[in-house]
């Protein structure tokens, strides 16, 4: 017992959930999630712990508007995994779901939406519409992948230096 003592429990902190992997059994238990506190298990099994608090990640997506003008959106993605579905998330995507799923998906969706607007529309009256479309598409795509997108915030719209120079010279 002394030898295996530290390998027989995991202390799950507030804002975390755990899923258990049975090495000699059926593998990952996707049905049960473990909450905060000390959780015991046999030493050959493993507890995988996920942070389920709301998180924010900054991302920049480079693309072209409907006229082919190079522009970029700097965005903040506010998200968290679905607490009771982290076993499924771990089984289908893994612990690095931000890099494997969220970042590629925001890139694809933002590029698709950006090219439907002109740069002038993006910086003026259509910015909120653009944000809302990206947000709704992300929510729909990732809900079935066990991730909740709370909000997408556009923090900056960036254009190429040549275009910016031409605008300031006018």
Protein language model regions, located:
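Amphipathic, coiled-coil-like alpha-helical scaffolding segments used for oligomerization/assembly
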Residues: 67, 78, 98-162
């Amino acid at each position: 017992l002394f030898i295996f003592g530290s390998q027989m429990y995991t202390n799950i902190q507030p804002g975390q959930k755990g899923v258990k992997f049975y090495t000699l059994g059926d593998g990952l238990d996707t049905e049960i999630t473990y909450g905060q506190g000390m959780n015991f298990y046999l030493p050959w099994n493993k507890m995988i712990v996920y942070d389920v608090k709301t998180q924010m990640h900054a991302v920049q997506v480079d693309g072209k508007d409907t006229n082919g003008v190079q522009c970029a959106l700097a965005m903040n993605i506010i998200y968290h995994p679905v607490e009771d579905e982290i076993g499924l998330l771990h089984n289908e995507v893994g612990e690095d779901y931000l890099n494997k799923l969220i970042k590629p998906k925001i890139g694809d969706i933002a590029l698709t939406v950006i090219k439907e607007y002109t740069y002038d529309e993006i910086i003026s009256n259509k910015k909120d519409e653009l944000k809302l479309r990206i947000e709704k598409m992300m929510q729909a795509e990732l809900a079935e992948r066990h991730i909740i997108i709370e909000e997408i915030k556009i923090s900056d719209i960036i254009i190429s230096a040549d275009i910016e120079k031409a605008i300031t010279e006018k």
